[in-house]
Structures are given as structure tokens and as C-alpha cells.
Amino acid sequence: MKTLKLNNWPYPIEYHEDWENIINHISDVIEETGPWLLEENTSPSHENIFKQLKQSLKDKRVCIVGIDPYPTDATGVPFESPDFSKKTIKAIAENISRRYNVRLFKNYNFLFVEGVLAWNYYLSCREGETKSHKIFWERLADVFINHIAAYVSVFYFLGKSDFSNFRSILNSPTTVVVGYHPAARNRQFDTDETFEIVNTLLELKNEPRINWVQGFEI
């Protein structure tokens, strides 16, 4: 693990070497925007905003992307909810449990699913306000996504309205699936088959399927 220390950001940013190629870009942007970001009460907290940079990328096949963190109590790990109270992760867990016949579980976390990286397009929001930090991340969001694209085989974007323009995000041809947001109206996500579609796409690429059941805390 490496560490990035900045003049205008008081928290050391730990990162895996797989992110090295964009660290200078991150440094330049945060040196400029960090002071304004520090003035906000954020979700996740300032020291946890870059937590996912600790994740390796070479061992990832799929990246699941949400638009931004929970507006309260985000941990820095996308979709993570330590007390399993968040509607989004509960809907995800219920969808996967129905498909793979997991009946009893206490929580779900993509962090434990081999080959999967969970990511937020915007790494933070103002506490209580979704999509409120677009201005802080617009210079880095696509940089992150395109860097991840060099490693993974499939992107799964959660939210048809949020990611309707995904083709303008990616600079290179990448297999992309855009599904319903877990909190979508009319409970469209309940019958969404995208987790299995992702596995079918991996098989077509002669890559191992994802064992989504690994994310359950039983």
C-alpha cells in the first residue's frame, strides 16, 4: 500500500499500486478543490472518501457503479451499510437471495465478492443531499471510470436515468450493462436479472462467473 500526502488535504490517502497511473491527476485536482470540500459536512466523512483506492484492480472482473454515496452514514465502501438499514443494499440482497436461494442473511457487502469492485461515480455528497458534490468530482469521475475500465471486463451501472449517457463516460469500448436503481419506483429492481446477465457476459468472454452469494453475511 502506498500513501499520498497533500498540502490542501489533511488526511493521507492510502492507495494500491494499481491506481498509480492516475495518482498525479488526483493530487492536482484535490490540491485545488480539497479546501472547498473540507468546508462541507460530507458523506462519507472526509477521511473515508478515498477508501476504495485501497482496493486492487488486477483481480477484478466486474465494477458495479452507483451515482454517489448514501447521503448519511456512508462508510467509503459503496453500498455498504453496517447495520443493514439502507434501502439500496437491502433491495440488492433481496434480488440476489431470490435468484440464488439464500433464505436467511444478516447483511450484504460487495467487498466480500471475489472479482467485484463497488464504486461511486461521485465519491462524496453533502450530508443529507444526494448528487450535491457533482461540482467537486466532475474533473475526476470519468478519470476514475476509465482507469478502472483498463482492468475490468464488465461495468454494471445502477440507475438508468443516472447513467443514460454512459457512452460519453467511457473512452474505450467496454462491455456495459445499465440496470434499474435498487430504489427505483414500482420496484422494477425486484425482478431485474442483471446479476445473472453479468455472469453470462463473463462466460462469453471465457472468464469465471461471479459468485454473488459471497456477499452475504449469514
Curated annotation (Swiss-Prot):
Pfam family, one: UDG
Taxonomy, superkingdom: Viruses
GO MF terms held by the record: DNA binding; uracil DNA N-glycosylase activity
Biological process according to GO: base-excision repair, AP site formation via deaminated base removal
Reactions mediated catalytically: Hydrolyzes single-stranded DNA or mismatched double-stranded DNA and polynucleotides, releasing free uracil
Active-site feature positions: 68 (proton acceptor)
PROSITE patterns: U_DNA_GLYCOSYLASE
Signal peptide positions on this chain: none
Entry-linked CDD domains: UDG_F1_VAVC_D4-like
Enzyme Commission number, as recorded: 3.2.2.27
Cited InterPro entries: UDG_fam1, Ura-DNA_Glyclase_AS, Uracil-DNA_glycosylase-like, Uracil-DNA_glycosylase-like_sf
Enzyme class: hydrolase
Keywords: DNA damage, DNA repair, DNA-binding, Hydrolase
Protein function: Excises uracil residues from the DNA which can arise as a result of misincorporation of dUMP residues by DNA polymerase or due to deamination of cytosine. Also part of a heterodimeric processivity factor which potentiates the DNA polymerase activity. Binds to DNA.
UniProt subunit comment: Homodimer. Interacts with protein A20. Component of the Uracil-DNA glycosylase(UDG)-A20-polymerase complex; A20 and UDG form a heterodimeric processivity factor that associates with E9 to form the processive polymerase holoenzyme.
PANTHER family: URACIL-DNA GLYCOSYLASE
Family, per entry: Belongs to the uracil-DNA glycosylase (UDG) superfamily. UNG family.
Name of the protein this chain belongs to: Uracil-DNA glycosylase
